[in-house]
Amino acid sequence: MSVYTRPLARLIEHLQKLPGVGPKTAQRLALHLIQRPEAEIAAFAEALLAAKQQVGHCQRCFHLSSEDLCNICRDPKRDAQTICVVADPRDVIALEKTREYKGLYHVLGGLISPMDGIGPEQLTVQALVRRVAQEQTQEVIMAISPSVEGETTTLYVGQLLKPFTRVTRIAFGLPMGGDLEYADEVTLARALEGRRDLT
C-alpha cells in the first residue's frame, strides 16, 4: 500500500523522469508544489506548456528558438565566418557564459553512438556540411565533450568539413568523459583560446 494518494504518487512519478531528480527530490518537489497557491501552480503549468509548444529549433544552427532564427544567428555583430559545433543546446549556453566566443554555432543534436543506434543520419551533420559550403565559413571549431562518442563525432565531422574550411577543436582542461555544461567559465574560455587544428 502506498503512503501517497494516487494524484501525488503520479506527480512524484513524473518528476522523477526529470534529469538528476531521484525519488527523494521528486517527493520534496511534489510536496512543495501541492502546498503552493493554485494560481501559482496554474502559472507554472502554463509556462511549462507554452515553452514546450513555442520553443523549437533555429532553422540555421538548430539551437533553441521560438522564431525561425535564434537570437545568435540574428545578431549582426556575430562573426558569421566562424561556426562552433556543439552536441547540445546546453553547450551553447555554457560557451555563451564565457563571453569569449563571438561567432555562430551549429548544434548537432547529439553524438555519434552506434551502441545507442545513433549514426550521423540522426544528427544535423549534413545540414552543417551544406551550411559550411554555402556560407564559405573560414573556420569551424569543434567543441565536443571529450568522450569516446565525442571523439568519434569530432573526427567524423572534421573529415567531412576539411575540404571546405579550416577545422579546429577546443583545447581541453576538461577530464575525459566530462561534459561542457559542467565546466566553469574560465576553463571554457581557456579551451576556446587554446584551440588547435584537427589532425
Curated annotation (Swiss-Prot):
- Zn-finger (C4-type) intervals are 58-73
Q: Which cysteines are joined by disulfide bonds?
A: none
Gene Ontology molecular function: DNA binding; zinc ion binding
Ranges in coiled-coil conformation: none
| Domain spans labelled Toprim | 81-175
Give the record's keywords alphabetically. DNA damage, DNA recombination, DNA repair, Metal-binding, Zinc, Zinc-finger
Q: Which SUPFAM superfamilies match?
A: Recombination protein RecR
User: What InterPro entries is this protein classified in?
Assistant: DNA_Rcmb_RecR, Rcmb_RecR, Rcmb_RecR_Znf, TOPRIM_dom, TOPRIM_RecR
One GO term under biological process is: DNA recombination
This protein's record includes keyword Transmembrane: no
PANTHER family given for it? RECOMBINATION PROTEIN RECR
Q: What does this protein do?
A: May play a role in DNA repair. It seems to be involved in an RecBC-independent recombinational process of DNA repair. It may act with RecF and RecO.
The family line of this record is: Belongs to the RecR family.
* Protein name (Swiss-Prot/TrEMBL): Recombination protein RecR
What's the source species for this entry? Synechococcus elongatus (strain ATCC 33912 / PCC 7942 / FACHB-805)
Encoding gene per record: recR
